[in-house]
Protein backbone atom coordinates (compact mmCIF):
# COMPACT_ATOMS: atom_id res chain seq x y z
CA UNK A 1 0.00 0.00 0.00
CA UNK A 2 1.49 3.39 -0.97
CA UNK A 3 2.07 5.87 1.86
CA UNK A 4 -0.88 8.09 2.65
CA UNK A 5 -0.44 11.78 2.02
CA UNK A 6 -1.02 13.78 5.21
CA UNK A 7 -1.94 17.44 5.53
CA UNK A 8 1.13 19.33 6.76
CA UNK A 9 -0.52 20.23 10.06
CA UNK A 10 -1.43 16.57 10.77
CA UNK A 11 2.04 15.22 9.99
CA UNK A 12 3.58 15.69 13.46
CA UNK A 13 0.79 13.73 15.17
CA UNK A 14 0.74 11.16 12.39
CA UNK A 15 4.52 10.76 12.64
CA UNK A 16 4.11 9.62 16.24
CA UNK A 17 2.29 6.56 14.93
CA UNK A 18 5.59 5.49 13.40
CA UNK A 19 7.14 5.49 16.88
CA UNK A 20 4.33 3.20 18.04
CA UNK A 21 4.93 0.86 15.11
CA UNK A 22 8.63 0.80 15.99
CA UNK A 23 7.71 -0.25 19.53
CA UNK A 24 5.62 -3.07 18.04
CA UNK A 25 8.59 -4.14 15.92
CA UNK A 26 10.88 -4.16 18.97
CA UNK A 27 8.36 -6.23 20.94
CA UNK A 28 8.05 -8.74 18.09
CA UNK A 29 11.84 -8.98 17.84
CA UNK A 30 12.24 -9.37 21.63
CA UNK A 31 9.61 -12.11 21.74
CA UNK A 32 11.29 -13.97 18.88
CA UNK A 33 14.66 -13.77 20.66
CA UNK A 34 13.22 -14.90 23.99
CA UNK A 35 14.34 -11.77 25.84
CA UNK A 36 13.19 -11.21 29.43
CA UNK A 37 9.50 -10.18 29.22
CA UNK A 38 9.72 -8.18 32.46
CA UNK A 39 12.45 -5.98 31.00
CA UNK A 40 10.38 -5.53 27.84
CA UNK A 41 7.27 -4.62 29.88
CA UNK A 42 9.28 -1.96 31.73
CA UNK A 43 10.35 -0.52 28.37
CA UNK A 44 6.72 -0.59 27.21
CA UNK A 45 5.55 1.13 30.41
CA UNK A 46 8.20 3.83 29.86
CA UNK A 47 7.01 4.31 26.27
CA UNK A 48 3.42 4.51 27.48
CA UNK A 49 4.22 7.22 30.02
CA UNK A 50 6.64 9.25 27.90
CA UNK A 51 4.94 9.03 24.49
CA UNK A 52 1.58 7.35 24.35
CA UNK A 53 -0.26 9.27 27.08
CA UNK A 54 0.46 12.63 25.47
CA UNK A 55 -0.31 11.26 22.01
CA UNK A 56 -3.69 9.97 23.19
CA UNK A 57 -4.35 13.36 24.84
CA UNK A 58 -3.67 15.23 21.58
CA UNK A 59 -5.97 12.90 19.65
CA UNK A 60 -8.74 13.05 22.24
CA UNK A 61 -8.56 16.82 22.79
CA UNK A 62 -7.95 18.05 19.24
CA UNK A 63 -8.19 15.34 16.56
CA UNK A 64 -11.33 13.41 17.54
CA UNK A 65 -13.50 16.54 18.13
CA UNK A 66 -13.19 17.25 14.40
CA UNK A 67 -15.53 14.29 13.81
CA UNK A 68 -17.50 14.57 17.06
CA UNK A 69 -18.01 12.31 20.06
CA UNK A 70 -20.87 10.33 18.47
CA UNK A 71 -18.93 9.43 15.32
CA UNK A 72 -18.43 5.64 15.13
CA UNK A 73 -14.77 6.06 14.15
CA UNK A 74 -14.15 8.19 17.24
CA UNK A 75 -16.01 5.74 19.47
CA UNK A 76 -13.87 2.90 18.15
CA UNK A 77 -10.64 4.87 18.60
CA UNK A 78 -11.53 5.80 22.19
CA UNK A 79 -12.31 2.18 23.02
CA UNK A 80 -9.01 1.16 21.45
CA UNK A 81 -7.18 3.76 23.58
CA UNK A 82 -8.56 2.19 26.75
CA UNK A 83 -7.49 -1.36 25.88
CA UNK A 84 -3.74 -0.72 25.40
CA UNK A 85 -3.75 1.42 28.52
CA UNK A 86 -4.85 -1.61 30.55
CA UNK A 87 -2.26 -3.81 28.83
CA UNK A 88 0.63 -1.38 29.33
CA UNK A 89 -0.12 -1.19 33.05
CA UNK A 90 -0.82 -4.90 33.72
CA UNK A 91 2.04 -7.11 34.89
CA UNK A 92 0.32 -10.40 35.75
CA UNK A 93 1.37 -12.14 32.52
CA UNK A 94 4.05 -10.04 30.79
CA UNK A 95 4.61 -12.49 27.93
CA UNK A 96 0.94 -12.54 26.99
CA UNK A 97 0.63 -8.77 27.50
CA UNK A 98 3.57 -8.07 25.21
CA UNK A 99 2.03 -10.15 22.47
CA UNK A 100 -1.34 -8.41 22.90
CA UNK A 101 0.26 -4.95 23.01
CA UNK A 102 2.11 -5.67 19.78
CA UNK A 103 -0.98 -6.96 17.98
CA UNK A 104 -3.51 -4.44 19.27
CA UNK A 105 -1.35 -1.33 19.11
CA UNK A 106 -0.32 -2.13 15.54
CA UNK A 107 -3.95 -2.72 14.48
CA UNK A 108 -5.03 0.48 16.24
CA UNK A 109 -2.35 2.58 14.55
CA UNK A 110 -3.23 1.13 11.14
CA UNK A 111 -6.92 1.96 11.74
CA UNK A 112 -6.15 5.53 12.77
CA UNK A 113 -3.77 6.15 9.88
CA UNK A 114 -5.78 4.48 7.12
CA UNK A 115 -9.31 5.34 8.23
CA UNK A 116 -9.73 7.86 11.05
CA UNK A 117 -6.98 10.37 10.17
CA UNK A 118 -7.97 10.11 6.51
CA UNK A 119 -11.53 11.10 7.44
CA UNK A 120 -10.35 13.90 9.75
CA UNK A 121 -8.20 15.24 6.94
CA UNK A 122 -11.20 15.26 4.59
CA UNK A 123 -13.54 17.21 6.89
CA UNK A 124 -11.33 19.35 9.14
CA UNK A 125 -11.28 23.11 8.74
CA UNK A 126 -7.96 24.92 8.60
CA UNK A 127 -8.67 26.25 12.11
CA UNK A 128 -9.16 22.73 13.45
CA UNK A 129 -5.93 21.56 11.82
CA UNK A 130 -4.10 24.55 13.30
CA UNK A 131 -5.47 23.69 16.76
CA UNK A 132 -4.16 20.12 16.42
CA UNK A 133 -0.75 21.43 15.40
CA UNK A 134 -0.73 24.04 18.17
CA UNK A 135 -1.60 21.51 20.89
CA UNK A 136 1.03 19.13 19.59
CA UNK A 137 3.58 21.94 19.61
CA UNK A 138 2.72 22.88 23.20
CA UNK A 139 3.17 19.32 24.41
CA UNK A 140 6.35 18.85 22.38
CA UNK A 141 7.89 22.07 23.69
CA UNK A 142 7.23 20.95 27.26
CA UNK A 143 9.07 17.69 26.40
CA UNK A 144 5.98 15.60 27.07
CA UNK A 145 5.77 14.18 23.55
What are the functions of these language-model segments?
Residues 1-145:
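Small-residue-biased structural context
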Amino acid sequence: MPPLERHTLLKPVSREHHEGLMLCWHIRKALAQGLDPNVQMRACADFYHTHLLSHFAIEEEAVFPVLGAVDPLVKRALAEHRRPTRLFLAWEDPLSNLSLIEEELKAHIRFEERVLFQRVQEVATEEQLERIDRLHGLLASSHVV
